[in-house]
Amino acid sequence: MSRYDDFTEVERAILRIVQSNLPDSLTPYADIAREVGTDEETVLALLRSLKEEGPIRRFGASIKHQRAGWNHNAMVAWKVDPAIVEEAGTKAAEHPHISHVYYRPSSAPDWPYELYTMIHGRHATAHMDVIEQLRRETPLEEFAVLESLRELKKTSMTYF
């Protein structure tokens, strides 16, 4: 059993609030503290410890990329030699137009692609520039492009 199995009710209440939208104010942490019946330092200490220990990877604003002009997306599936997955995946993850990189081994005979990158662009063919760059900078060659036609659901996971 880990520390995370034993959150107090106050900690759970804090986490329920911060996993959605922070209060729109100059003192969001004090506002959260007031709402859950604790002090601001308790809120900050919890968030700081979870960030340091790893369950909170990052804490920041979520941008609605379509409204910011990044409305063309493509999932690019790459055929990758398992020996270079780390190298190729790390290089792809460094690219500013790639938001997600996953390695998913496949046993399907007609689907040899195992490394997946989500590429975002401002125009319909922007992903091709990123693909060509990755092909120049890594041993990746064979790929399949799965373009996003429509977003059917996009929500952040809620845990508490």
UniProtKB/Swiss-Prot annotation:
It is an enzyme of class 4 (lyase). It catalyses: siroheme + 2 H(+) = 12,18-didecarboxysiroheme + 2 CO2. The keyword Ribosomal protein does not apply. Pathway: Porphyrin-containing compound metabolism; protoheme biosynthesis. The keyword Nucleotide-binding does not apply. Its EC number is 4.1.1.111. GO terms for molecular function: lyase activity. One of its GO terms (biological process) is heme biosynthetic process. Keywords: Heme biosynthesis, Lyase. Involved in siroheme-dependent heme b biosynthesis. Catalyzes the decarboxylation of siroheme into didecarboxysiroheme. Binds heme b, but reducing agents do not affect the activity of the enzyme. Belongs to the Ahb/Nir family. Forms a heterodimer composed of AhbA and AhbB. Also forms heterotetramers. This is Siroheme decarboxylase beta subunit. It comes from Nitratidesulfovibrio vulgaris (strain ATCC 29579 / DSM 644 / CCUG 34227 / NCIMB 8303 / VKM B-1760 / Hildenborough) (Desulfovibrio vulgaris).
